[in-house]
């Protein structure tokens, strides 16, 4: 009898369980689409929070540009609270530039950055010019790598905690490219590569830029992924009136919006609950803390305005009113305080012999615990050297531990640098410099500098770097000087002269804040006039030349070049002067310290 009852129970459970599972699987799938919009996309975070509070499950997510960034991070497990905290603590001015932290720059690069107010890259080939941008987006790309640790392999985005897709545009043929797989951080970077601002992402034969120029609200993409119900968050501005189209960026942006309008309207029609955020008064570049706070608040308000619509979706989805989705996240990111065990470290894009020096410079060791903060500092050190224009990394899990790979690109840049100076003596002077990293067997750099003003000058430098951070420099400089000499606040006399200098030197950077150098120099002074306030004073000065040997060192840890608040600075130089390599005017050489 007992066996009969037991058999009946087992049979009943076996019959009822598939029906129960089938009923759960029968609910409709929900997709969320997040539009592009730059800084305005901050509103997505709070809108997602309201969708969660309404008890709506999210089965798919697709986005463009900033929507791709928020959507991609949400898809791997970031909670809305984590996203909120992350965007608020970022230095967006730094992230949206290619600046390198001063502490990671070499002394030479620090001096150059302080001397010039404008630095403009110019390209070597038409290929670079066609695919260029004002910025490489290096800092932003490194942030994406930091935020996606654990997803650095080429992966299938459908296998993420929430299946994800993002949109980019291929400028080779104008086609929409939908990322369903690949390296997540690269896909997000491609989707937000604003043309003319950030350099595009090159992949195979494609040149990829911001997907907003072809599909800024990809509801069709999330539908194709399998979504039956679509919730959309749109942070695009409405088309501007004539009186608002006052600049080239305004007009170009309007042209793109008009081009995409038909596709946008079709995608809105696919949406079951459409959340349109009021972004009036804000632009794609509104990354100030106050703007971020307001945009997030407006995103939450816009989503709550659709609260009844969200609740009504539950019936369409096929879930109960008290349905609670499974918990989302949190993403266990590699924080600055958390460590991972790294078994091996590799460098892609460099000579094998350079690994030892790079390991020393990065201050990293294989078979040791390493934090994100250490990796970040290593990236700054690599980009701060004169050898590499870009540096990124991947951190992939292996059975023995993590494999850390740095991807480096040799620096073969050409730049035009401009500086301007105002003072009461010269009124104004302009400094113009052109610098090119040359593709020679031994890394080298050529620099031409001109100074326009009352005291004009020209200089040429050629630098060879046979070993990392050790270089030989050859230079020639010409200066015309017009100098007033003052006594008790009044001009006593004026002198003009021409100065020529040829120099050969060796420099060694033992430590990033310390530089030591020595060399030889030939100087020639050709004096022209000495004008005295008192006519009875006269002076005849013959032209003269010096052959000197010098040694110099500098130590600098200032946090800023001008008006530093912390750090220290020390510099010293010693020169021994002769006129025939050994003696001066028949006597022992004289020195200056």
Q: Can you annotate each of these PLM segments?
A:
Residues 210-214, 454, 498, 588-590:
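Short, glycine/acidic-rich beta->alpha junctions
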Residues 166-168, 516, 570:
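A short, Trp-centered hydrophobic/proline-enriched beta-strand micro-motif
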Residues 373, 378, 384, 392-558, ...:
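Gram-negative/organellar outer-membrane beta-barrel architecture
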Residues 554, 564-566, 570-593:
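Extended beta-strand-rich architecture
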């Amino acid at each position: 009898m007992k066996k009969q009852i037991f058999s009946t129970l087992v049979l009943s459970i076996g019959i009822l369980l598939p029906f129960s599972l089938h009923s759960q699987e029968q609910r409709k799938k929900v997709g969320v689409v997040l539009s592009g919009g730059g800084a305005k996309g901050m509103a997505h975070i709070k809108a997602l929070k309201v969708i969660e509070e309404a008890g709506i499950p999210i089965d798919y997510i697709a986005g463009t540009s900033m929507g791709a960034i928020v959507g991609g991070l949400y898809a791997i497990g970031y909670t809305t609270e984590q996203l909120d905290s992350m965007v608020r603590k970022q230095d967006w001015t730094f992230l949206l530039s290619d600046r390198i932290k001063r502490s990671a720059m070499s002394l030479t690069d620090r001096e150059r950055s302080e001397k010039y107010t404008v630095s403009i890259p110019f390209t070597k080939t038409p290929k670079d010019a066609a695919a260029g941008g004002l910025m490489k987006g290096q800092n932003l790309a490194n942030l994406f790598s930091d935020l996606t640790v654990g997803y650095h392999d080429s992966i299938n985005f459908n296998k993420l905690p929430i299946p994800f897709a993002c949109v980019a545009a291929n400028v080779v043929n104008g086609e929409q490219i939908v990322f369903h797989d690949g390296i997540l951080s690269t896909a997000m970077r491609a989707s937000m590569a604003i043309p003319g601002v950030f350099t595009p992402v090159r992949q195979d034969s494609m040149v990829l830029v911001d997907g907003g120029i072809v599909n800024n609200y990809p509801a069709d993409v999330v539908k194709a992924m399998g979504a039956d119900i679509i919730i959309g968050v749109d942070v695009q501005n409405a088309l501007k009136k004539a009186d608002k189209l006052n600049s080239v960026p305004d007009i170009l942006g309007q042209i793109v919006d008009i081009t995409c309008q038909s596709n946008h309207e079709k995608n809105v029609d696919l949406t079951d609950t459409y959340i349109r955020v009021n972004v009036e008064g804000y632009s794609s570049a509104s990354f100030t803390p106050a703007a971020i706070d307001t945009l997030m608040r407006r995103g939450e308000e816009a989503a709550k305005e659709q609260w009844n619509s969200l609740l009504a979706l539950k019936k369409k989805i096929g879930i109960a009113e008290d349905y609670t989705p499974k918990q989302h996240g949190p993403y266990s990111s590699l924080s600055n305080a958390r460590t991972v065990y790294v078994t091996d470290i590799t460098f892609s894009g460099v000579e094998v012999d350079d690994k030892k020096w790079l390991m020393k410079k990065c201050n990293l060791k294989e078979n040791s615990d390493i934090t994100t903060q250490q990796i970040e500092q290593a990236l700054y050190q690599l980009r701060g050297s004169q050898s590499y224009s870009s540096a990124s990394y991947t951190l992939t899990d292996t059975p023995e531990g993590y494999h850390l790979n740095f991807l480096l690109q040799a620096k073969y840049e050409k730049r035009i640098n401009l500086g301007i100076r105002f003072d009461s003596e010269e009124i104004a002077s302009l400094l113009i410099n052109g610098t090119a990293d040359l593709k020679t067997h031994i890394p080298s750099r050529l620099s031409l500098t001109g100074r326009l003003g009352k005291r004009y000058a020209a200089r040429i430098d050629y630098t060879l770097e046979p070993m990392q951070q050790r270089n030989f420099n050859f230079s020639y400089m010409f200066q015309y000087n017009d100098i007033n000499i003052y006594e008790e606040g009044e001009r006593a006399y004026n002198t003009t002269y021409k100065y020529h200098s040829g120099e050969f030197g060796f420099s060694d950077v033992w430590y990033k804040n310390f530089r030591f150098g020595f060399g030889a120099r030939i100087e020639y002074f050709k004096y022209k006039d000495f004008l005295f306030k008192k006519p009875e004073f006269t002076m005849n000065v013959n032209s003269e030349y010096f052959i000197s040997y010098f040694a110099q060192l500098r130590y600098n840890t200032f946090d800023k070049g001008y008006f530093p608040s912390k750090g220290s600075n020390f510099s010293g130089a010693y020169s021994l002067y002769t006129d025939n390599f050994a003696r001066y005017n028949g006597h022992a050489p004289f020195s200056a310290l």
